[in-house]
Structure formats: structure tokens, C-alpha cells
């Protein structure tokens, strides 16, 4: 029913996902076991928080990505060898680049933009900051009030990603294994908890499935952990 009626939502509908589901009398199982986990996985946000996300924005995203139809789904393609392939291609075109060189500060003057990293000062005509907004704000030594308001208005939350080979994080039935596998039971953290199957997503041919699990490290066998990384995603409030 949701797939059938979702596109009839008006462009000026300002209801949240939770308000829409209640108003349109969708059952709790539909919201708790499908729509909220799906949105939570897409935006890496806990189900409690994502319930406040605008229903209009969700429907637009679902429509653009072919998620409102069970048939005629789009055929997704990916770059062979993953992002490393195009990162290396871009790097090959660059004159100079610095790796593992965190920017300490960016100061604007009438003559140049002064960038400081590793204690060294670099002068540029212009600097493009391609980071999260809170990181950009911390770099600027003299942010304007407008920059402080815009860059400081977005909150971020930490998500822990673990690369591992512990198949116990996947569904019991092998037939139910998908590229994205959401963990619903016992999720009291209000964080997105799911496991990505990288063998499906990136066509890996490894003997054991390479899995990436968000925010459930306590459920993973430590002996099967390969890498732990922490990411920060915007809070959709």
C-alpha cells in the first residue's frame, strides 16, 4: 500500500515519517520492521531519530532510487575494484598532493589564504574545503557570523564500522542473505545497526564473506575482526 500511495504525498507535506504512518494508519510492523529500518540504514541514523525525518524527502529518495516498486528495479553498477580505482586515477592527474596531512588552520588575508599543516604554512589564492561542516568550521580562524550559523547548525554522530568475517551477524537462513542486513532485535542504542555483505556489494571472491557491521562490535567474535574504523554522519533532526 505504501508503494502505491506514496507518490500522492503533496510537495508541501511537512509531516515526519512517524506522523505520516500514524495519520495514514500503517501498522506498527510496517514501520518498525520495514520503513524505519530501511531509512535508518540509508541515512546511518537510529530508528528513533529517523522517525522525525520528513516523509516527503524519504518518498522523493525512494522514488529516485527505484524503491517504490517490487518489479522493474534499476540495475545498479559499480566501478570494478571499488573507489580505489578512481581515487588512483584522480591522483595520477594531480601535480602535487599531501597524504596524512591534517589541516590545522585556514586564515584569510587580503593577499592570500594561509593554510597550516604539520606546522608548515602554505599560501594559496583560494582554498576549497571538502569536509563535514563542523570540521570546516574548526579549520577557519576567522569565521563570519553567517559561516558560524550555517556550518555550526548541523550535528554529527559517531558510527563504528567493523570489517570482519563473523557470519553469525548475518541472517540464519543463507537464502535471506542480502547486501544490506539490518539488525532489529535488541537494538536499544538508537543507532543504525546493520551488516553489509561486501562479497555481494563489491563482488569479492574471498573464501569467507567479508562483512562490515555498524554499531554492533560487541556481537562480533574478536578473533574475526580485520579492521575497525569510526565515521561521523549528520544527524537528521
Question: Where are the regions that the model predicts?
Answer:
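Mid-domain catalytic core of redox enzymes
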Residues: 102-236
Amino acid at each position: 500500500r505504501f508503494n502505491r500511495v506514496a507518490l500522492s504525498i503533496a510537495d508541501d507535506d511537512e509531516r515526519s515519517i512517524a506522523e505520516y504512518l500514524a495519520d495514514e494508519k500503517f501498522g506498527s510492523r510496517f514501520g518498525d520492521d520495514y520503513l524505519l529500518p530501511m531509512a535508518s540504514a540509508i541515512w546511518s541514523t537510529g530508528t528513533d531519530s529517523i522517525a522525525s525525518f520528513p516523509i516527503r524527502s524519504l518518498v522523493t529518495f525512494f522514488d529516485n532510487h527505484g524503491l517504490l516498486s517490487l518489479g522493474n528495479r534499476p540495475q545498479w553498477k559499480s566501478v570494478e575494484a571499488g573507489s580505489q580505482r578512481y581515487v588512483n586515477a584522480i591522483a595520477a592527474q594531480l601535480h602535487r598532493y599531501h597524504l596524512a596531512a591534517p589541516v590545522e588552520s585556514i586564515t584569510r588575508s587580503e593577499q592570500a589564504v594561509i593554510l597550516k599543516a604539520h606546522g608548515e604554512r602554505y599560501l594559496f589564492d583560494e582554498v576549497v574545503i571538502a569536509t563535514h561542516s563542523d570540521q570546516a568550521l574548526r579549520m577557519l580562524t576567522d569565521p563570519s557570523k553567517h559561516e558560524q550559523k550555517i556550518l555550526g547548525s548541523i550535528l554529527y554522530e559517531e558510527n563504528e564500522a567493523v570489517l570482519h568475517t563473523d557470519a553469525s551477524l548475518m541472517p540464519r537462513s543463507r537464502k535471506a542473505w542480502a547486501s544490506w542486513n539490518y539488525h532489529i532485535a535488541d537494538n536499544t542504542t538508537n543507532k543504525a545497526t546493520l551488516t553489509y555483505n561486501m562479497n555481494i556489494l563489491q563482488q569479492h571472491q574471498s573464501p569467507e564473506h567479508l562483512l562490515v557491521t555498524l554499531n554492533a562490535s560487541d556481537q562480533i567474535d574478536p578473533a574475526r575482526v580485520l579492521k575497525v574504523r569510526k565515521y561521523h554522519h549528520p544527524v537528521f533532526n
